Amino acid sequence: MPALALTDLSNLFGAVKFYKSAIDSGIKPIFGADVWIENDASSEQPHKMLLLCQDQQGFNNLSELLSKAYLENQVRGKPMIKKNWIFESHDGLIVLSGSLHGNIGKLLDQNKISEAREELLLWKKIFQDRFYLEVQRYGDDLWRKRENQYIEKVIFLAAENKIPLVATQPIQFMDPDDFRAHESKTCIADGNMLADKRRPKNFTE
């Protein structure tokens, strides 16, 4: 494996330790973060995107964006980055659309093709060849059905607008034995009971 990215949610706290471990293992470290993007229509339902640092300038810009979100724009404890902040400080950053959790994915999930096209063209205009449409496959059967429908639509838009696709997997733990511990953590964060069979199950072993 020539390179590896670490993308925690809304922080770069693991960057130094990750850098040292990666270098010691002969692996190129890539810094980045999953970030909350403010939803103009509803502050309670932010979008999620993935930002990766291309160079030192990108790392500096991502650090500043995260700090600004924590200091100026928290909603229910979630630090949210405004879209125009990213557009003003995009140098050195690569952006992935967030699959079904991003604004484009949500629009496609609602079958709002024209609005999704308009949104992706806006990001392409700013980031040019540093913008990627993201696809994922994980979660329970119901979620996978939505993913498959999304993938079919996003492949069409990617080809139509000459935007590259990238497949990612939201890896949360290294060993399958850690699955139950991670589920417990997820339940605590979301206010669900581990024994509740009706609760959302967003991850698998």
Regions found by a protein language model. Give the residues of each.
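Phosphodiester-processing cores and adjacent nucleic acid-binding clamps
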Residues: M1-E205
